[in-house]
Amino acid sequence: MPNISRKPPPRFYSPSHSPSPSLYAPIQSPPAPSYDYHANPRTLNPFSDAREVGGYAQLQGEDQMTGAPLYQPPYAPQLLVAQPTPVSSRLPFFEAALARARGIQTPSLPEAPTPAYAQPLPSYLPPPDPNHPDLSVGLTQANTVRYAINPRSQLKEGSRSPSPFMDDSFVYNDAAHLYNVEPDVEKALLGSGLGYESEKRVESSMGFNDNDGDLSVPQSFGGRPPSWEPSGILDEKGEMSTTKHFGPAPAGRVGRRAHNAAGYRRIKQSATLDENGFFAIEMNIPTRLAQFLPIKGVEEQKTTRYTAITTDPDDVPAAGFRLRQNMTSPPRQTELFIVITMYNENAELFCRTLYGVMKNIAHLCGRKNSRVWGKDGWQKVVVCIVADGRKAVNPRVLDCLAALGVYQEGAMTNTVKDRPVTAHVFEYTTSFALDGDLHFKYPDKGIVPCQIIFCMKEKNAKKINSHRWFFNAFAPLLSPNVCILLDVGTQPAPKSIYHLWKAFDVNSNVGGACGEIATFKGKTWRSLLNPLVAAQAFEYKMSNILDKPLESLFGYCTVLPGAFSAYRWIALQNNGDGRTGPLASYFAGEQLNTGKADTFTGNITWQKIESCVSKSAKPKANWVLKFVKAAVGETDCPDTIPEFIAQRRRWLNGSFFAAVYALMHTNQIWRSDHSFARKSALMLESVYNFLNLIFSWFALANFYIFFVILTSALEGSAFNVPHIDVLNTIARYGYLGALVGCFIFAMGNRPQGSPWKYKAAIYFFALLTTYMLVAAVLCTVQAIKNINSPIFAKMVVSLISTYGIYVISSFLALDPWHIFTCFIQYVLFSPITDLLLLKLISMFHDLSWGTKGSDATQASDLGAVSGVGKHVEVELVTAQQDIDIAYQDALDNIRLRGSKVDSAESEPKKEQSEQAQKDTYANFRTNVSIAIMLVQKKRDDAKS
């Protein structure tokens, strides 16, 4: 629509009518009577016979007041030369006040009005919204005072002139004019509707004199103090405020500003629940995102569907909830259903995982000769992102989802007809991606559409509950062939998902599979400079070379890592009674929160142990578990000792109780439909797991015995090392003292609260390991000299069985690079297993999933859906302008990478402060306990 000018033209007099001497003098006469709008319609046509001049309707012919003849020049009106005034209104307010105080006479410049024409909006600007005015022009000299003082007066054109000398608005009675003739590029870009060398017209107010209380207009030109309230802003004490030019100062902390002063406004509107009572709404995507869509008109890419779920995840399918894939005609067949679980991980880790998944989908679409995949293969893959708690999600992750078009905060609500919302579900098919560096990737880079379901739980109910939403709420609606589990931070290689799916496709007996977990090394493998990361990289690689292939050969993997694993959907189904089976036994671990589960049941559910056993030993089935080496997933491993200990403590709890549970239920293998050879192989694997459990239990004592034997060998006459016995005695007592200290640390101190205690113990064990390796090398050299002695054979066998197997197997697997980059770090950190074992034993009672808490209260910051029946009222952010503003804010936050956030986001929470206080008390208790033990030890030595 055209941008209509709102300023009336100036009053022009005919030369034949002799003006009075007071015409060019300052006008002191009272204001003219009000103009009757209905009797004299206004027009913007400069060639019309009737024109509004100064609040009167004048015809070409005679003056309505004096009867004098008038004429109006069509293009070159006569210029009016104004006389000097005491204070010019063209000065900014503060300079005008200063000039008035000093008594300075400032001349007024002549006014050169030109006819006003309606200026169309620029083509690059969106169409105006009548409900959301354009607030791009800020508060200025003229309109600020009117905002603050006279609510009855009209809002005249505000000045944005950069000149400190004069203002470019000139007020004459009730008509305001712009007299500048120089092009103002700033006004043109801001959409003020001004053309070069043109004038913008302002309509007069409805019978009010707009100069009443306008401090920007001098009294000689009709301006005067307000007759009904003081010219200024009164503060709380009733005194004049000094901020009347800019408005009152905001109270309290000012949050992050939006692009528009309107912010994200929720507008109350009526809505209709669906036939099953769910509140679902289709939200338009941002305008900027719609402009870059590769294919226009696709409904699933034009809108984002939001649904507020108020039921338990187990009751979602029975309640009649449907996804977009169920609404198509015909319903889409889902081959792969991928879940990405997250808590509070940062945006880089999230985008790295999602980008890896989208590259895998692009690879599936590129397999043109496949009977399953091809050009439209993306329609057979659905990605489900489950966030554990709305308040716990990283805000930058939500910005990334909003940038992709998946998430819109303005659509969410807290309750639906007094029923609390348990999960917010967003559905959208995005055509773009964000890589790990938060850079957009478009379809020209190989990105294909991706169907995304974003389920954000209202409360933090831990990871096992996130899997329950995936398996019990969404998977039954899609009935996928294969379900893939991913954690945020694990990036699958471009072909990994295909290789995982292929393992199920070529062998119908495969019920579960896992890929190779590798550490994320970064560019040029710079992460390996951290010895802790290098040690984990070596451990992961050796597990994928030795352990996983052996277990896959037998047909049963003790643990399928939740970070990167896949399951056949029909293999996960429970038994006929519905109370037993893989999923039922797995989700029994959620009873930990209700106090209905014992310690043993709580620990075995950590690593999905029962799920693995139930699939392999499922009655009347012959499912096997496979390891797929070609499917590689890079995970972000812990790079600090506190994070490493917290993670491995959970893993050790799961693996330890996994072995115990598997051994206790070995007889269930004979109830399955496996062949006799397969059952025999599984029994042999059970024996292997039993021996491995025994060695793990005695690993602490075995390491100490090995240390004592090697260091004591240096005391022999063959080495002739002076005073080596003193050094060995100190090392042994230090070893035992460190073990006792680790027991105390493990039982009373968190790794996050006492990092230096754990670091000191680990570094001391690494020093003792170095001493032990030196002793082993010296003993080996001495044994080589006596090659015919029995000790040589024992030494060679022991070294080959421990370290030689790593080197030989790595070269046989044609993957030896970790031997050259990570072997030394792994050997030095090998004693950390002692600390982890002590931590495991000391924390058997702790069934929490790390440091992640849970919410207990229902929030009420999003509004509510209220009404009777299916017709309800709800407050939503549905205006396109506000949606575009929110989208631009998300893009800005991604670009800033979270460098500028609200201070409240960085403030420590109350729970964190309380935990820090508890850690301080625990450190004091541990220090006192260690001091008492040392004093008691010295006292016993003195007595002896």
UniProtKB/Swiss-Prot annotation:
Its EC number is 2.4.1.16. Induction: Induced by high temperature. Repressed by the antifungal agent caspofungin. GO terms for molecular function: chitin synthase activity. It catalyses: [(1->4)-N-acetyl-beta-D-glucosaminyl](n) + UDP-N-acetyl-alpha-D-glucosamine = [(1->4)-N-acetyl-beta-D-glucosaminyl](n+1) + UDP + H(+). Disruption phenotype: Abnormal capsular morphology: lower fiber density, abnormal fiber distribution, decreases capsular diameter. Decreases extracellular vesicle secretion. Sensitive to high temperature. InterPro entries: Chitin_synth, Chitin_synth_fun, Chitin_synth_N, Glyco_trans_2-like, Nucleotide-diphossugar_trans. Keywords: Cell membrane, Cell wall biogenesis/degradation, Glycoprotein, Glycosyltransferase, Membrane, Transferase, Transmembrane, Transmembrane helix. It is found in: Cell membrane. The chain crosses the membrane at residues 690-710, 726-746, 761-781, 791-813, 827-847. One of its GO terms (cellular component) is cell septum. GO terms for biological process: cell wall organization; chitin biosynthetic process. It is a multi-pass membrane protein. Glycans are attached at residues 3, 326, 603, 653, 927. Pfam families: Chitin_synth_1, Chitin_synth_1N, Glyco_trans_2_3. It comes from the Eukaryota. Polymerizes chitin, a structural polymer of the cell wall and septum, by transferring the sugar moiety of UDP-GlcNAc to the non-reducing end of the growing chitin polymer. Belongs to the chitin synthase family. This is Chitin synthase 6. It comes from Cryptococcus neoformans var. grubii serotype A (strain H99 / ATCC 208821 / CBS 10515 / FGSC 9487).
